[in-house]
Amino acid sequence: MVTKPSHNLRREHKWLKETATLQEDKDFVFQAIQKHIANKRPKTNSPPTTPSKDECGPGTTNFITSIPASGPTNTATKQHEVMQTLSNDTEWLSYTATSNQYADVPMVDIPASTSVVSNPRTPNGSKTHNFNTFRPHMASSLVENDSSRNLGSRNNNKSVIDNSSIGKQLENDIKLEVIRLQGSLIMALKEQSKLLLQKCSIIESTSLSEDAKRLQLSRDIRPQLSNMSIRIDSLEKEIIKAKKDGMSKDQSKGRSQVSSQDDNIISSILPSPLEYNTSSRNSNLTSTTATTVTKALAITGAKQNITNNTGKNSNNDSNNDDLIQVLDDEDDIDCDPPVILKEGAPHSPAFPHLHMTSEEQDELTRRRNMRSREPVNYRIPDRDDPFDYVMGKSLRDDYPDVEREEDELTMEAEDDAHSSYMTTRDEEKEENELLNQSDFDFVVNDDLDPTQDTDYHDNMDVSANIQESSQEGDTRSTITLSQNKNVQVILSSPTAQSVPSNGQNQIGVEHIDLLEDDLEKDAILDDSMSFSFGRQHMPMSHSDLELIDSEKENEDFEEDNNNNGIEYLSDSDLERFDEERENRTQVADIQELDNDLKIITERKLTGDNEHPPPSWSPKIKREKSSVSQKDEEDDFDDDFSLSDIVSKSNLSSKTNGPTYPWSDEVLYRLHEVFKLPGFRPNQLEAVNATLQGKDVFVLMPTGGGKSLCYQLPAVVKSGKTHGTTIVISPLISLMQDQVEHLLNKNIKASMFSSRGTAEQRRQTFNLFINGLLDLVYISPEMISASEQCKRAISRLYADGKLARIVVDEAHCVSNWGHDFRPDYKELKFFKREYPDIPMIALTATASEQVRMDIIHNLELKEPVFLKQSFNRTNLYYEVNKKTKNTIFEICDAVKSRFKNQTGIIYCHSKKSCEQTSAQMQRNGIKCAYYHAGMEPDERLSVQKAWQADEIQVICATVAFGMGIDKPDVRFVYHFTVPRTLEGYYQETGRAGRDGNYSYCITYFSFRDIRTMQTMIQKDKNLDRENKEKHLNKLQQVMAYCDNVTDCRRKLVLSYFNEDFDSKLCHKNCDNCRNSANVINEERDVTEPAKKIVKLVESIQNERVTIIYCQDVFKGSRSSKIVQANHDTLEEHGIGKSMQKSEIERIFFHLITIRVLQEYSIMNNSGFASSYVKVGPNAKKLLTGKMEIKMQFTISAPNSRPSTSSSFQANEDNIPVIAQKSTTIGGNVAANPPRFISAKEHLRSYTYGGSTMGSSHPITLKNTSDLRSTQELNNLRMTYERLRELSLNLGNRMVPPVGNFMPDSILKKMAAILPMNDSAFATLGTVEDKYRRRFKYFKATIADLSKKRSSEDHEKYDTILNDEFVNRAAASSNGIAQSTGTKSKFFGANLNEAKENEQIINQIRQSQLPKNTTSSKSGTRSISKSSKKSANGRRGFRNYRGHYRGRK
């Protein structure tokens, strides 16, 4: 009796199906046997006899357990036993049947199929056929008499044997074909494996560039892989087809055998050799011939399989139970454990249903039915189902009208192979489709808390909304990740109400709102959005900077500092390495602000239905300011250049680039709103790209005009995207400056911050969520910490009022950047939530590593990359050795050389800032300090006082200066070396943004380097990888400072991958200027260069940095080098006799001439790392086709020219400038660059002791009374420009002179602007040396003359503009331009202009900070405020850090 499977619905279902089929098969076989025996033999009563072993032949096996030979009386009480075996690959079914009714019938011999196993031989050597024997128990004599019939049955079954031979041949052919196809498949897989390995080697190669890798992969590897995949698929299909053909032929063969052999019915099928062990030779039971049999009969439709089992194991008892295994008709697919039917008692019939009554059969059927269960709806709802569709058990009861797919399908119609709702526990692990509680939670039921999404839902028909959404779709609400194309996230609109908009961003479809908790944290979403990088090991770069962990060494270090009489850096200054950034200084305030905004959101968003926003949308506001209403804010550092001034008519006609629908409006806004005559390089390209909806990466030097790239598109309404521009800015002080500047231009700009009253924040937030602002400045901490801010942005996006996202100072995104901010990495939120909104990333400092990080972390999509030269020609770079008198040298220079001029002194820590500021105050200099440890209001007051010239010098950490709007900074001192070359460029770039000559002076000390190393190594917030990164960057700074030979400008620009010819420096750095005072010699470094190339070539595949290679070449035995066995290289230690600076110079030169090459790779942390490899010119060097020679200093000057004596008057010196000026980009090289101030008046600068530095207003002979105020201002500006040029030219002379052109001549030149030598001669008696020097002023005079003529035209334009403005106030038909025609950019609705004016006034009240105090009070509050020191004490400190008591 078959045991019914339990706790398994699928098994139970299959078992029922198999049982029904099996009973039919049994009926068919039994009837055929009955008919055959009844017709062939008479009934006799003979005792059963067991044949001898010799009769059966040597190939027999004791297999079937029969009735012992105890005579006819014993057999008369036995029931029929019929043995039949149904076989598949691993399962067999056996039945044994005997009948006392046919005990006298002799045996019937049926020849077996012999397609696989050859026939065994008789003892005589003759070949005989094996037969499957059906032998009822009979007398031995009858068996002996019929033995001849057994052997003679060969002729009677000749046709069957022939058919078997044909089947054998067909089956062998099919198997050979399958084997051949499988061999071909194996070879194809091997070829595919080789191609994949080759692909991996190309990807991991360090000797190939990225372009070369892509070319090889696309040209060689990918086509072959594609062809190989097609070939493998084809072979797999052929193998499957061949197997199916063989199976079908076996089935037809089996059917033909059964149908054509009435006299040769197969009565027994042997079990598989794997399932059965042969009996012993001493067995007295009936034996049957062990031959191969068909794997399955035609009844089951299985494949034919021939096996042979020879009796070798004779130790098993013949009384072993027979196993009858139920065949699973899908065993080829499901490797299920067999269901075993074990032979029961002797009275158990083989076919129980033939002997059962109807009642017994009904009882058996009831016992075998599937267990009853309630009807359950397993179907997942789709788009056509109603919203109230519910999965679960109550579908029929609660929703009788819903038609189920299961009702249309019968159990037999279901394919078990694809069944997904009845699985076992083992299958659950593989398919994860077992029904569990999460299936019932798939649909949000109505019993959820109705107030859970109050902020986002209105009282509308939810089901109708979702049905509408499912029909129309919302392309804006579905994000398809580029990393995983199958992951889609449906975002929600913060409001259910759809505001109509004509913009691209608006689609009138209601959004499906997800639960708030799911939006805040979704594990599946996080996993799908995260990038996966290989966990391969990358050898990290090594620095030769020694570890300073010894306390004794630190004590000796401090003792040396004290002996020198100056307070150097010490461990007391150790703090978190990046603490000076303004990181998360407002987190607590942001949390409080977020709570306030939540209240605002609840009031505003829930009341939108009652008080909908006005139907009008903000259009272009009417500008009331005229050209004459320029204020001193026009010198904003990023969007004005005096040298670019041309007439407006010329600008409007000069459009060489492509034109767009918004081009006219862009030019109009540029002139009328920003009061600018034209664009700087790359500005127009950036504006057009973002108005097209593209992502943009803008890389411009400081003062290059980055802000205009997003401020101008913010006021242009005709682009593809329009609305509110969100600007992510790192510093609150920077945001305040930007907002104040934009409000002065009547641009609706505001900022989110925790400052101000709750009412002011409420007003700003209401303007923001309604899309009434052009620009909104938000800090990255606000984006990551405030959920209300994110919801407001989501509402803007849903309403089609989100124009673009701007990331200012984007280098903060990169871990390689000098101002890394962790919250910046969260800004990828924008491209994931709003993928179709364009993004702009702007920065002034970005190496190749930083650029890769920015694009990767912000997830920019094919950004338009705009880059220009980083060369700041008006900056003078100088590096001096730091001594104990350095602070006094700085004080003397500020009081003499930089008298009445503002500047910055950068220090490395808060303590150093306070000490330096106190020392300068004691020397009579108006100075204050600025660092991140101060209160925000204190920092703001110091910054405002410095910008208003109430403070001359500000001592600050790196927390100060980012985006500072002060163009006339004349000097930047680094009292301590900067931490990175990026930071050095950024901080020095804050000088001379008006284009005038400025100085960048750095003081260098190895003790400062060692102290900063200690700060990095002891920073607990940095892991080992980041510590090495910072140490490597610090070593680059050290190499830059210690280099006294190469051009400073070339060294800085090479860091940004920009090639620069040092001849173009024109002695604008200390190394180029001092080159005349040192003795250099030329050395041939070809041989060391070859050794370096061989060294790099031998270890470049291990991803080594250039600093690591320098250490190996120098002979370092650091732990990394020893562990990597690089100390055994032939090139190790070859350069031990050379100085470290010389080795660094050689490596740097090899990279410059492309013998070596640096490349960047994204590491496991998601940041780019730079490594070195041989370059394209390495082969020329190794083959002797290239020689390398370099200049080395053999006698460096003992002391550099003192900065205090740089301006000694020397009238007889001729400037060392080429007599034939070289033109670069249209400018004379001797002249300063064209980045100059926008102010109409610059202060007078006096240099110590010089008589030329008068600060009183300029008066011209007998003409001042006849000139207007505007003309006088122009004269003063012209004089200052010429005077500044004279100072710059004097600085370039060797030695420098302080009176390159006398003041009296400069004043006359400012009045008449002579264009040639003859006009210059009319100035009066002029010495010959000044006539020779006049040629250096010609280009500047031509520029000034052009500007003066354009201002004369603007004077008349101003009168016309004023007239039309007055006329517009009295007319309601619009405003006319100066040409008399109506501007298409002005709206006819004057109410709109009034509303815009009200919005700007409201912003001013809520955003503008209070005015700073007067000069005296401001200075007094700064200089005398008692700050809390680093040790917690209050009071004044002298420079050495000692506290003085109050008097």
Swiss-Prot record:
Q: What is its EC number?
A: 5.6.2.4
- Every copy of the HRDC domain together lies at 1272-1351
Q: Where does ATP bind?
A: A714, V715, V716, K717, S718, G719, K720, T721
Cell compartments where the protein resides: Nucleus, Nucleolus
Which residue numbers does the motif DEAH box cover?
Answer: 808-811
Q: Which superkingdom, per the lineage? A: Eukaryota
Question: Per its Swiss-Prot or TrEMBL record, what regulates the activity?
Answer: Helicase activity on G-quadruplex DNA is inhibited by ATP-gamma-S.
Q: Which reaction does it catalyse?
A: Couples ATP hydrolysis with the unwinding of duplex DNA by translocating in the 3'-5' direction; ATP + H2O = ADP + phosphate + H(+)
What does the UniProt keyword field contain? ATP-binding, DNA-binding, Helicase, Hydrolase, Isomerase, Nucleotide-binding, Nucleus
Q: Where is the composition biased (Basic residues)?
A: 1425-1447
GO biological process terms held by the UniProt record:
chromosome organization; DNA double-strand break processing; DNA repair; DNA replication; DNA topological change; double-strand break repair via homologous recombination; gene conversion at mating-type locus; meiotic chromosome segregation
Location of the Helicase ATP-binding domain: 687-864
Question: Which cofactor does the UniProt annotation name?
Answer: Mg(2+)
Which stretches are tagged as biased composition: Low complexity? 1412-1424
Q: What binding details are noted for the cofactor?
A: DNA helicase activity on G-quadruplex substrates requires Mg(2+).
Domain Helicase C-terminal: residue ranges: 886-1035
Q: Which SMART domains match?
A: DEXDc, HELICc, HRDC, RQC
**Gene3D superfamilies reported in the protein's UniProt record:** HRDC domain (1.10.150.80), P-loop containing nucleotide triphosphate hydrolases (3.40.50.300), Winged helix-like DNA-binding domain superfamily/Winged helix DNA-binding domain (1.10.10.10)
Q: Name one GO cellular component term.
A: nucleus
* Pfam families linked to this entry: DEAD, Helicase_C, Helicase_Sgs1, RecQ_Zn_bind, RQC
The UniProt entry's sequence similarity note says: Belongs to the helicase family. RecQ subfamily.
Q: How does it assemble?
A: Heterodimer with TOP3. Forms a complex with TOP3 and RMI1. Forms a ternary complex with a MLH1-MLH3 heterodimer (MutLbeta) during meiosis. Interacts with TOP2.
Biological role:
ATP-dependent 3'-5' DNA helicase able to unwind duplex DNA or DNA:RNA heteroduplex. Unwinds G-quadruplex DNA; unwinding occurs in the 3'-5' direction, requires a 3' single-stranded end of at least 7 nucleotides. Helicase activity is higher on G-quadruplex substrates than on duplex DNA substrates. Assayed with a catalytic fragment (residues 400-1268). Telomeres and rDNA are notably G-rich; formation of G-quadruplex DNA would block DNA replication and transcription.
- Output this protein's name: ATP-dependent helicase SGS1
Q: Which gene encodes it?
A: SGS1
